[in-house]
A protein has these predicted regions:
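NTP/phosphate- and nucleic-acid-binding module
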Residues: 1-573
Length: 573
C-alpha cells in the first residue's frame, strides 16, 4: 500500500513563464514544473518531484545491472590524485578535472569517472583467474568542470551517473561482459521509455579501442550522429568513418598555376572554376599539441573533425593565428601542398589518397594550382581519417547514403583492455601460472541525463508527459471543489482505493480555480488524471484523462479504481 501526497504540502514551485536561459525543452519544463532549480552554472538542486523520478531511474538501472550479474558497491567521490598519476590521466584530462589539496597539502580530485579507484581497489584482491570475471558498479555524483555548462541537466558540472567496471581473464570473457552490458543498457532505455540508438563512438579520455553510445534521438540533442536505414549502421560524428566520393579537380592533369584574385574561400574557388566544392581541396593551417606547424587537407565540401584531429595532432591542437601564418610564410585562403614552406608537416585526409588531380592553394596570394598530384608534385607526410561524415556520404558497411540526426548520449560502454591494469599493476595468475594484466571494461549510464532525455522526448505544448515507469506520481486526483463534503468524501474513497492497489497518487487539494489546477497538472505531466467535477459527481461519475493522448472518459465512481489500476500496472516496465 502506498501513501498519497497532497499538493497543499508538496514542494513544487511552478513557474508561469519560460526561464530566459533555458535552451532545451527538458531544461525549460523541469524548471517550470518545479522539479529542479539552478544553484550556479552547471549545478542544480533536484526538488521532490524530480528526485522521485531520479530514484525510479536508478532502480531500473539497479534491476538490470543486478540481472546481468553485476554487484553494487560505493566508492569515494574524493580520489587520491596519485592514482590518476599512476594511470597517466591527471594531465591528459585537462581542466575539466576538479583538483584540490586537503589541509595536509595532499592532492585529491573529485571523480569524473572511477577507473583508477576501482583498479586500485581490486589489484591486491583479484589475483587468480578463478575469481574472474567480476563486474562492480555504483551510482554516484560525478564532477567535471565544464568550460561552458549548458542545456540544464544535459551538460552540468555535477551530475549523477552509474558507472560499472568489469574484470576478465580473457578477451572472450570481456566480450561476454560487454555484450551483457549492451543488452542491459538497451533494456534500461526501453523501461525508461527512451528511444535510443546504439552508435559506434569514440572512446575519448577514458580509453580503449571499442565503444558504443546509446543516443536518445532529439532534434535539440547536443551530439551529431549518422545512421544507415538500409543496414542499421550508426555512429556519432566523432567516430564515423566513410569513403567520401571525391571529384577530381579541373584541368588536364598538368600542374597549372591559375590567378584567382580575392578568391580565398572554397565557395569562391569552386564557382570560379565552375566545379563542385568536392573537386577542391581545403587546406587548414594548425599548430599541433607539441607546438609544431601542420597543414591538414580535406575534401573541399567536408569539415575537419575535431575529435579525429585530436587523435592525429594531439589534444590542444589549434588553428594558427594570423601572426603565425605570417611567421611560417602561409597565406590564408591560398594555402596548399605544393611549395609548402620547409618544416611544415603535411597531413591529408585518407579519402584523398587515390585522387590525382587536385585544385588547391598555391601558397601565394591570389593564386591556386589545378592538376596537383600527390607524390609527383608534393609529398604527404601522413594520411589519416580527418573528416566529419555528413548526410549523403556512403555508409561504410553497405555503401547506401547515410542520414543525419541529433541525439543525447544517455549511456556508453567501453572495452578498455589493459590500459589501466598495465599502468597500475593490476595483475592475476592465469591457468598456466603466468602473471597477466586484468582485462577491463567500463560501462556508464547518465542517470540525471536520462531524466532530461525522457522529458526531451516526452512533452507537448502544455508540459511534460511522463511515462508511467519514471513518473514522479502515476495518478493525479483533482477534486475541483475539495471543501465540499461530497467531493471530499469521493476523493478520499478513490485515493484510498488507488493506494491500496499500490498506485502512486498525488492529490491536488489546493483551493485554486479549475483552470489553474488543470494547467499545473498538465505541466507536471502525471500520466493519468482523475477529475472530480460538480456535474460528474451529481451523475455518479468522475473523468479519467490520459495525459499522453488527451483522451477523456467518464467512469462510474465505483469503477474508477479498478480501471486506473489496470492501466497503470500495464504501463509499468
Amino acid at each position: 500500500m502506498t501513501r498519497a501526497m497532497y499538493m497543499s504540502k508538496l514542494y513544487a514551485p511552478t513557474l508561469k513563464e519560460d526561464p530566459a536561459d533555458a535552451e532545451l525543452a527538458s531544461h525549460r519544463l523541469l524548471l517550470r514544473a518545479g522539479m529542479i532549480r539552478k544553484e550556479a552554472a552547471g549545478l542544480y538542486s533536484y526538488l521532490p518531484l524530480a528526485w522521485r523520478s531520479i530514484r525510479k531511474i536508478e532502480n531500473i538501472v539497479r534491476d538490470e545491472m543486478d540481472a546481468a550479474g553485476a554487484q553494487e558497491l560505493m566508492m569515494p567521490i574524493m580520489v587520491d590524485a596519485e592514482l590518476w598519476r599512476e594511470s597517466g590521466r591527471i594531465d591528459a584530462y585537462g581542466k575539466e578535472l576538479v583538483r584540490f589539496d586537503d589541509r595536509h597539502g595532499r592532492e585529491f580530485v573529485l571523480g569524473p569517472t572511477h577507473e583508477e579507484t576501482v583498479t586500485a581497489l581490486v589489484r591486491n584482491e583479484l589475483r587468480s583467474y578463478k575469481q574472474l570475471p567480476v563486474n562492480l558498479y555504483h551510482i554516484q555524483d560525478k564532477f567535471r568542470d565544464e568550460f561552458r555548462p549548458r542545456f540544464g541537466l544535459m551538460r552540468g558540472r555535477e551530475f549523477i551517473m552509474k558507472d560499472a567496471y568489469s574484470f576478465s581473464a580473457t578477451q572472450e570473457s570481456l566480450q561476454e561482459e560487454y555484450d551483457k552490458m549492451k543488452q542491459a543498457y538497451a533494456n534500461i532505455c526501453e523501461r525508461c521509455y527512451i528511444k535510443a540508438l546504439p552508435v559506434v563512438a569514440d572512446s575519448g579520455e577514458i580509453g580503449g579501442d571499442t565503444s558504443v553510445e546509446y543516443m536518445a534521438l532529439a532534434d535539440a540533442g547536443e551530439a551529431s550522429l549518422v545512421y544507415c536505414d538500409d543496414c542499421g549502421f550508426a555512429a556519432d560524428d566523432e567516430a564515423a568513418s566513410t569513403k567520401v566520393v571525391v571529384t577530381e579537380g579541373p584541368g588536364d592533369g598538368t600542374l597549372t598555376k591559375v590567378e584567382t584574385p580575392g578568391m580565398g574561400t572554397i565557395e569562391a574557388v569552386a564557382k570560379f572554376f565552375g566545379f563542385p566544392e568536392n573537386g577542391t581541396r581545403k587546406s587548414l593551417a594548425l599548430i599541433d599539441a607539441e607546438g609544431k606547424p601542420v597543414v591538414a587537407i580535406v575534401p573541399g565540401d567536408h569539415e575537419l573533425n575535431d575529435c579525429k584531429a585530436e587523435h592525429v595532432f594531439g589534444k590542444g591542437y589549434r588553428m594558427m593565428t594570423d601572426e603565425e601564418l605570417q611567421t611560417y610564410g602561409l597565406h590564408k585562403g591560398f594555402i596548399g601542398p605544393v611549395n609548402l614552406p620547409e618544416g611544415i608537416r603535411l597531413v591529408c585526409d585518407e579519402n584523398l589518397r587515390e585522387s590525382k588531380q587536385w585544385a588547391c592553394g598555391a601558397n601565394e596570394v591570389d593564386y591556386h594550382f589545378t592538376g596537383a598530384c600527390p607524390e609527383r608534385d608534393f609529398t604527404v607526410d601522413e594520411w589519416a581519417d580527418l573528416v566529419t561524415v555528413v548526410a549523403g556520404d556512403p555508409c561504410p558497411h553497405c555503401g547506401k547514403p547515410l542520414s543525419a540526426a541529433r541525439g543525447i548520449e544517455v549511456s556508453q560502454v567501453f572495452q578498455l583492455g589493459t590500459k589501466y591494469s598495465e599502468a597500475m599493476g593490476a595483475t592475476f595468475m592465469d591457468e598456466d601460472g603466468k602473471e597477466k594484466p586484468l582485462i577491463m571494461g567500463c560501462y556508464g549510464v547518465g542517470v540525471s541525463r536520462s531524466l532530461a532525455a525522457v522529458v526531451e522526448q516526452h512533452n507537448d505544448e502544455h508540459g511534460i508527459v511522463w511515462p508511467v515507469s519514471v513518473a514522479p506520481y502515476e495518478v493525479a486526483v483533482i477534486p475541483l471543489d475539495p471543501k465540499k463534503e461530497e467531493c471530499a468524501n469521493v476523493c478520499d474513497q478513490i485515493v484510498e482505493g488507488l493506494c491500496a492497489e499500490g498506485i502512486e497518487v498525488v492529490v491536488d487539494d489546493r483551493d485554486e480555480r479549475p483552470g489553474f489546477k488543470f494547467a499545473d497538472n498538465d505541466l507536471m505531466g502525471f500520466p493519468y488524471q482523475v477529475v472530480l467535477g460538480k456535474r460528474g459527481l451529481k451523475n455518479g461519475t468522475v473523468e479519467l484523462k490520459d495525459r499522453a493522448t488527451g483522451e477523456r472518459e467518464d467512469l462510474a465512481i465505483d469503477e474508477v479504481v479498478a480501471k486506473v489500476a489496470e492501466l497503470v500496472k500495464a504501463a509499468r516496465r
